[in-house]
């Protein structure tokens, strides 16, 4: 008997479950369909994060305006896994994997029998290279190994944008400061610490600055502060984002983040290629 039920108008996703709904109930979400005609729809790869409004401070520490960050973020049920995989990949790819030890067959010398087999009162011994003797070989010691892990560029970008979105959405997690490169006529750490205090930053807390171009005097004034990281889009990485207590951005850096990691960002053609280098530009 043929069913009289009509086809649903649309599909929507709620709490990782598939429900039928009308066209006016479709939430704004970004989904990826693996194969057309396969009848299977994959889970959302990324969704728009909550719009984060950030205050803009002048060099003197006064609020002069507001700006926003609207970045892609992984769904709540997969965000932790996406960020964890990306940070493990970065840390593993930084390992040299050159640790090496010598086995008893590689240790130099010790070919002669140390003493007679009998009449010494000692245990019989055939070589000085045995792992039981000082200077002998090592049993199951470390050997050179490639620790690198591959990760898709889209996945790495999603992890970075998720971390940035989380930091920006947290109360007091991020601020925007007007360009201050010309304010430092000469390198002086004392002046930079005073500026940080005007911006509400504690020098004892970890802070990450993201600037498009770092002035030479700014770089020299801040390099003696152990809790501070001064980054550019070329050196932006997930570890420093997660390790920082507060993010400090410039207006140009905000525009860069919205353009590269925002909801309307255009994906690159080679985003599906794998990455193994942890120091590549994110």
Swiss-Prot record:
Chain spans, region Disordered: 106-138
Which Pfam families does UniProt cross-reference here? Ribosomal_L4
The transit peptide extends across: 1-49
What GO molecular function terms would the record report? mRNA binding; poly(U) RNA binding; rRNA binding; structural constituent of ribosome
In terms of SUPFAM superfamilies, this protein maps to: Ribosomal protein L4
Question: Its Gene Ontology biological processes?
Answer: translation
Specify whether Transcription regulation is a keyword of the entry.
no
One Gene Ontology term, aspect cellular component: cytosolic ribosome
UniProt keywords (A-Z) are:
Chloroplast, Plastid, Ribonucleoprotein, Ribosomal protein, RNA-binding, rRNA-binding, Transit peptide
List locations, semicolon-separated: Plastid, Chloroplast
Give the matching InterPro entries.
Ribosomal_uL4, Ribosomal_uL4-like, Ribosomal_uL4_dom_sf
Quaternary arrangement and interactors, per the entry? Part of the 50S ribosomal subunit.
Q: What does this protein do?
A: This protein binds directly and specifically to 23S rRNA. May play a role in plastid transcriptional regulation.
Q: Which family does it belong to?
A: Belongs to the universal ribosomal protein uL4 family.
Output this protein's name.
Large ribosomal subunit protein uL4c
């Amino acid at each position: 008997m043929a069913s009289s039920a009509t086809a649903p108008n649309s599909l929507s996703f709620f709490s990782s479950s598939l429900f039928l709904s009308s066209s006016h109930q479709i939430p704004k979400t970004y989904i990826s369909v693996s194969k057309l005609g396969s009848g299977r729809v994959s889970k959302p790869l990324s969704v728009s994060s909550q719009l984060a409004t950030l205050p803009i401070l002048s060099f003197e520490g006064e609020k002069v305006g507001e700006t926003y960050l609207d970045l892609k973020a992984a769904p709540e049920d997969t965000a932790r896994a996406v960020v964890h995989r990306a940070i493990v990949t970065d840390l593993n790819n930084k390992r040299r994997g050159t640790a090496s030890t010598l086995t008893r067959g590689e240790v130099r010398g010790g070919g002669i029998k140390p003493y007679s087999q009998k009449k010494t009162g000692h245990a019989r011994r055939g070589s000085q290279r045995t792992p039981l003797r000082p200077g002998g070989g090592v049993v199951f010691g470390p050997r050179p190994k490639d620790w690198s892990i591959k990760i898709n560029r889209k996945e790495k970008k999603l992890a970075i944008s998720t971390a940035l979105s989380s930091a920006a959405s947290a109360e007091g997690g991020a601020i925007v400061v007007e360009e201050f490169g010309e304010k430092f006529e000469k390198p002086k750490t004392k002046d930079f610490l005073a500026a940080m205090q005007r911006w509400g930053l504690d020098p004892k807390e970890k802070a990450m600055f993201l600037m498009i171009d770092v002035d030479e005097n700014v770089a020299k004034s801040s390099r003696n502060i152990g809790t501070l990281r001064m980054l550019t889009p070329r050196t932006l990485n997930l570890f420093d984002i997660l390790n920082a207590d507060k993010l400090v951005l410039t207006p140009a850096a905000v525009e860069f983040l919205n353009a590269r990691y925002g909801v309307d960002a255009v994906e690159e053609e080679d985003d599906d290629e794998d990455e193994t280098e942890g120091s590549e530009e994110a």
